[in-house]
Swiss-Prot record:
Binds 1 [4Fe-4S] cluster per subunit. NCBIfam families: leuC (TIGR00170), PRK05478.1 (NF004016), PRK12466.1 (NF009116). It is an enzyme of class 4 (lyase). The keyword Lyase applies. Belongs to the aconitase/IPM isomerase family. LeuC type 1 subfamily. [4Fe-4S] cluster binds at residues 336, 396, 399. Heterodimer of LeuC and LeuD. Its EC number is 4.2.1.33. Catalyzes the isomerization between 2-isopropylmalate and 3-isopropylmalate, via the formation of 2-isopropylmaleate. It comes from Staphylococcus aureus (strain NCTC 8325 / PS 47). This is 3-isopropylmalate dehydratase large subunit.
Length: 456
């Protein structure tokens, strides 16, 4: 019987254990940041342990990093977390992409950009959006702090193999519709728990035609569909992305092995979902989880249960309204979902020559120093600033209410991030998840508009 892509990568990393029981996996790459690593390092100290593989452990600073003045951290807790990681990196011999360094940025952007993320690897990080790296044909998943310590000490982790769910996506994306709309549509249609217990393999002609940036967007939000893992078969687009990057010096001798990473024709999936995107519309969330979304042209749904009622109350909206009725106050272009160069380029096409609506505070936060530099070479910073956007330093920023970048209470924000939970962007903040193009158009018009009519 054939194997799925996920099965092949998983089986190559099993050190001990039987199928159906917890198995001990070897971990090829451990990415860490300032929030979920301090207690894990302290655990090593208390047990007088060393880091098992410091050469496979890489750190960056992202969650608490200020995006205006990166060297002036006013919050005491944030400053302590950042300085603690800097010290731990020195004490344990970990390579750190430090504040202001050329490669610093959101952890799920730093891995791919530096060439650390590669096909066939097992990758973990103390962050739920680690599935992003699955876009390269890797098994990548988020872990908790106790598991971070376990990987520190042993370079292994006990895991139970999930079932396989194939999501076959075909059709040509209409103008003004993007990878973000695909994953939001899937979650809206099948729910925030449809992927629970599964590894999601995204396949089909639509996926094959996506750039790596688009593929990462889709895998990034696998967790919002309840799945711990998202994975895509590596191909020439993948290999071209990895080639020549700083930590990809093994490329020439590895690429032939990477070409073996695919699901066999006779591989059996536990479940299959099929999607034709040829008539897909731009997506907008109206509620307080990513499942609560609509096509742009559709009204918000009727109230079906207490969760819907609570969401409408929190968001200050009513059934029957449409996205264009939302009174927006903020626009956020950023996060590990949509702060890559192609995202900023797409948004800049809409912004160029226009001005941010007077009722809107618009912020652009490149996901990494690499993206920021490349964007500035293309003059994107000038386009955004001339329009009235704030052009910030890289970091997680307004994706979560953990740093100075927060949406005021009661204000609606068009956001390119991945979560719209209550308080996610700050106490009382009202988040609407959209693509970068939709967010850019909203900034100019002061409300949500059909981006298909304005994209150039």
């Amino acid at each position: 019987m054939g194997q799925t892509l996920f099965d092949k990568v998983w089986n190559r990393h099993v050190l001990y254990g039987k199928l159906g029981e917890p198995q001990l996996l070897y971990i090829d790459l451990h990415l860490i940041h300032e929030v979920t690593s301090p207690q894990a390092f302290e655990g090593l100290r208390l047990q007088n342990r060393k880091l098992r593989r410091p050469d496979l452990t890489f750190a960056t600073l992202d969650h608490n990093v200020p995006t205006i003045d990166i060297f002036n951290i006013k919050d005491e807790i944030a400053n302590k977390q950042i300085t603690t990681l800097q010290k731990n990196a020195i004490d344990f011999g970990v390579h750190i992409f430090d504040m202001g360094s050329d490669e610093q940025g959101i952890v799920h952007m730093v891995g791919p950009e530096t060439g650390l993320t590669q096909p066939g690897k097992t990758i973990v990080c103390g962050d739920s959006h680690t599935a992003t790296h699955g876009a390269f044909g890797a098994i990548a998943f988020g872990i908790g702090t106790s598991e971070v310590e376990h990987v520190f000490a042993t370079q292994t982790l006990w895991q139970t193999k999930p079932k396989n769910l194939k999501i076959d996506i075909n059709g040509t994306l209409p103008t003004g519709v993007y990878a973000k709309d695909i994953i939001l549509h899937l979650i809206k249609t099948y729910g925030v728990d449809f992927g629970t217990g599964y590894a999601l393999e995204f396949t089909g002609e639509t996926i094959k035609n996506l750039s790596m940036d688009g593929r990462m967007t889709i895998c990034n939000m696998a967790i919002e569909g309840g799945a711990k893992y998202g994975i895509i078969q590596p191909d020439d687009i993948t290999f071209e992305y990895v080639k020549g990057r700083p930590f990809a010096d093994n490329f020439a001798k590895s690429v032939d092995k990477w070409r073996e990473l695919y699901s066999d024709d006779d591989a059996i999936f536990d479940r299959v979902i099929e999607l034709d995107v040829s008539t897909l519309e731009p997506q907008v969330t109206w509620g307080t989880n990513p499942e609560m979304g609509v096509n742009f042209s559709e009204p918000f749904p009727e109230i079906n249960d207490i969760n819907d009622q609570r969401a409408y109350d929190y968001m200050g909206l009513e059934p029957g309204q449409k996205a264009e009725d939302i009174d927006l106050g903020y626009v956020f272009l950023g996060s590990c979902t949509n702060a890559r160069l192609s995202d900023l380029i797409e948004a800049s096409h809409i912004v160029k020559g226009n001005k941010v609506h007077p009722n809107i505070t618009a912020i652009v936060v490149p996901g990494s120093r690499t993206v920021k530099k490349e964007a500035e070479k293309l003059g994107l910073d000038t386009i955004f600033k001339n329009a009235g956007f704030e052009w910030r330093e890289p970091g997680c920023s307004m994706c979560l209410g953990m740093n100075p970048d927060q949406v005021p209470e009661g204000v609606h924000c068009a956001s390119t991030s991945n979560r719209n939970f209550e308080g996610r962007q700050g106490k009382g903040a009202r988040t609407h998840l959209v693509s970068p193009a939709m967010a850019a158009a909203a900034a100019i018009h002061g409300k949500f508009v059909d981006v298909r009519k304005v994209v150039v």
